[in-house]
Amino acid sequence: MNFHSLYDQGFARVAAVALPVHPARPFENAREIIDAARELDTRGVAMAIFPELCVSGYAIDDLLLQDVLLDNVEKALATIVEASADLLPLLIVGAP
């Protein structure tokens, strides 16, 4: 057992992430999330929790009901999954 490893001691590093969110721009938000996930991976974070609706943006009212936005959110989520597959942190992101 490595005394200096918090994981060997039964702990996990968890991060609450605040990042710029761009309303109705899911691919730009995905890039922000992926960049943050890569940084957190280098810091040994096991779980990263992102804001609600961080993929779609929050202050867009009825745009959340538009199929074009929802389709792009699904594509952005797939991009996040693919880009983070080899990274340590479990990512919890918000999407409609």
PLM segments and residue spans:
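Hydrophobic structural segments
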Residues: M1-P96
